[in-house]
Swiss-Prot record:
The keyword Endoplasmic reticulum does not apply. PANTHER family: GRPE PROTEIN, GRPE PROTEIN HOMOLOG, MITOCHONDRIAL. Homodimer. It is found in: Cytoplasm. Its main location: cytoplasm. HAMAP family: GrpE (MF_01151). Keywords: Chaperone, Cytoplasm, Stress response. Participates actively in the response to hyperosmotic and heat shock by preventing the aggregation of stress-denatured proteins, in association with DnaK and GrpE. It is the nucleotide exchange factor for DnaK and may function as a thermosensor. Unfolded proteins bind initially to DnaJ; upon interaction with the DnaJ-bound protein, DnaK hydrolyzes its bound ATP, resulting in the formation of a stable complex. GrpE releases ADP from DnaK; ATP binding to DnaK triggers the release of the substrate protein, thus completing the reaction cycle. One of its GO terms (cellular component) is cytosol. One of its GO terms (biological process) is protein folding. NCBIfam families: PRK14139.1, PRK14140.1, PRK14148.1, PRK14150.1. This is Protein GrpE.
Length: 195
């Protein structure tokens, strides 16, 4: 082999080595780029997961709030229906109370004629039926004579001194009071003792 051929072979060897080195460097650089790209992809994936978790938490919170709101609406509706059942007759009962008062006033009068006695018994029976119907529907009578005065249940119409009774004791009842399922329909009008 001539010198020139030898030189060409050496140049080709060098070119092959250089090409191999360049290729190895490119592969290393490409691998580094791929590694960097994988790390970036991992960071992006972590960021996406975090965003999705935050969205999921927000949706869970909104769902819990909606569930709580629906539960509150259901309870409010049940309470409204219950109150409508309990107090639906309140206006009607209030309008009947003067009728009961009138009947009771009429029954206080003493009668002597036999026909009037029979009529009074019929009125007493009618009054009893009316009061029983009201009781059956949750209306209770308040006849607080002798009890302690309670401004939530009683309306003081007058005060009288009486050493036989303690202060704020109900001495007399002008007009009975009525409650409907624990709610005052009409306060009892009373006379209380004030010494």
């Amino acid at each position: 082999m001539s010198k020139q051929e030898k030189s060409n072979v050496e140049d080709k060897s060098l070119d092959i080595e250089t090409a191999a080195q360049v290729e190895t460097a490119q592969e290393s650089a490409s691998g580094a780029l791929e590694e960097l790209s994988v790390e970036e992809q991992l960071e992006r994936a972590k960021d996406t997961i975090k965003e999705l978790e935050d969205s999921c938490d927000q949706f869970k919170d909104e769902a819990l709030r909606a569930k709580a709101e629906m539960e509150n609406i259901r309870k409010r509706a049940e309470r409204d229906v219950s109150n409508a059942r309990k107090f639906g007759i309140e206006k009607f009962a209030k309008e009947l109370l003067p009728v009961i008062d009138s009947i009771e006033q009429a029954l206080k009068h003493e009668v002597k004629l036999e026909e009037a006695i029979a009529m009074k018994e019929g009125i007493e029976l009618t009054a009893k039926i009316l009061v029983d119907i009201l009781k059956k529907n949750g209306v209770e009578e308040l006849d607080p004579k002798g009890e302690k005065f309670d401004p939530n249940l009683h309306e003081a119409m007058a005060m009288i001194p009486n050493p036989e009774f303690e202060d704020n004791t109900i001495f007399d009842v002008f007009q009975k009071g009525y409650m409907l399922n624990g709610r005052i329909v009409r306060a009892a009008k009373v006379v209380i003792v004030k010494n």
